[in-house]
Swiss-Prot record:
Fe cation 2 binds at residues 101, 161, 195, 198. Its EC number is 1.17.4.1. Tetramer of two alpha and two beta subunits. Its cofactor is Fe cation. This is Ribonucleoside-diphosphate reductase subunit beta nrdF1. It comes from Mycobacterium tuberculosis (strain ATCC 25618 / H37Rv). The active site is at residue 108. Belongs to the ribonucleoside diphosphate reductase small chain family. The lineage of its organism: Bacteria, Bacillati, Actinomycetota, Actinomycetes, Mycobacteriales.
Length: 322
């Protein structure tokens, strides 16, 4: 064996918190735990067959793009931020996040295997490797993950979690608002629920880190973040046009993108970049985002985004003497 062993290894003690937010977020994430196998995606086969070939292709490409981003977040982003953690509990939260990002990526494969042919799947993954806009946004984020600035990593992560996913999330919410692919949309709501917590938590940790900087350093970081947002937004416009122009949906997607770009900035403690008038989300899509809009699957067939895990309480014979 070569090298020097660490002098001491510390066990994590959840009874001695350095930041109470770590436990709050841990409990939220573990309470939200889910797996795609519990969603009855096969119930969407009938409505999938009603989509045109162009609509099917766009849907598959959207989900493939989301798979790529989740893969990057699981294997590069969340893992890279573990080394930046200030508390052992933050490390634990980040390992949970990395695992759930892998669950998200696996979820799209569950959708594909249920609804799509092998050729459709293979064509979509080939497309994801060739699409310049998808590759560019992934490369921008991954480059910062592999850099040496912890706060830039966090800002990049928030941009991914709170902004870049949403040009893709629009599509299943659109279908759901029209009564199509409702179980698939329910799965996506579970993913959105996770990403909302991830974006909030990493943004909170970024703000905690910024508090230790000088005014000049904070100003530099704010300028960097705004430049990053506008670079990503310009690319995201091209990506949305590439995906949605043929269906005529692009003008509906762009306000939703701007709305979530502002949410990403808010998670980082910054003012919005886009006027409220330019961020008016289609009311039907907004309604579909409500977890209460999800399918309430029964206990045995599966669980939806509005599903509450069943509880039990032991009883005795006397409990039934009325």
């Amino acid at each position: 064996m070569t090298g020097k062993l660490v002098e001491r290894v510390h066990a994590i003690n959840w009874n001695r918190l350095l930041d109470a937010k770590d436990l709050q977020v841990w409990e939220r994430l573990t309470g939200n735990f889910w797996l795609p196998e519990k969603i009855p995606l096969s119930n969407d086969l009938a409505s999938w067959q009603t989509l045109s070939s162009t609509e099917q292709q766009t849907t598959i490409r959207v989900f493939t793009g989301l798979t790529l981003l989740d893969t990057a977040q699981a294997t590069v982003g969340a893992v890279a931020m573990i080394d930046d953690a200030v508390t052992p509990h933050e490390e634990a939260v980040l390992t949970n996040m990395a695992f759930m990002e892998s669950v998200h990526a696996k979820s799209y494969s569950s959708i594909f295997s249920t609804l799509c042919s092998t050729k459709q799947i293979d064509d979509a993954f080939d497309w994801s490797e060739q699409n310049p806009y998808l590759q560019r946004k992934a490369q921008i984020i991954v480059d910062y993950y592999r850099g040496d600035d912890a706060l830039k990593r966090k800002a990049s992560s928030v941009m991914l979690e709170s902004f870049l996913f949403y040009s893709g999330f629009y599509l299943p919410m659109y279908w759901s608002s029209r009564g199509k692919l409702t179980n698939t949309a329910d799965l996506i709501r579970l993913i959105i629920r996770d990403e909302a917590v991830h974006g909030y938590y990493i943004g909170y940790k970024c703000q905690r880190g910024l508090a230790d900087l000088t005014d000049a350093e904070r100003a530099d970081h704010r300028e960097y973040t705004c430049e990053l947002l506008h670079t990503l937004y310009a690319n995201e416009i091209d990506y949305a046009h590439d995906l949605y122009d043929e269906l005529g949906w692009t003008d509906d997607v762009l306000p939703y993108m701007r709305y979530n770009a502002n949410k990403a900035l808010a998670n980082l403690g910054y003012q919005p970049a886009f006027d409220r008038d330019t961020c008016q989300v289609n009311p039907a899509v907004r309604a579909a985002l409500d977890p209460g809009a999800g399918e309430n699957h029964d206990f045995f067939s599966g669980s939806g985004s509005s599903y509450v895990m069943g509880t039990h309480q032991p009883t005795t014979d006397t409990d039934w003497d009325f």
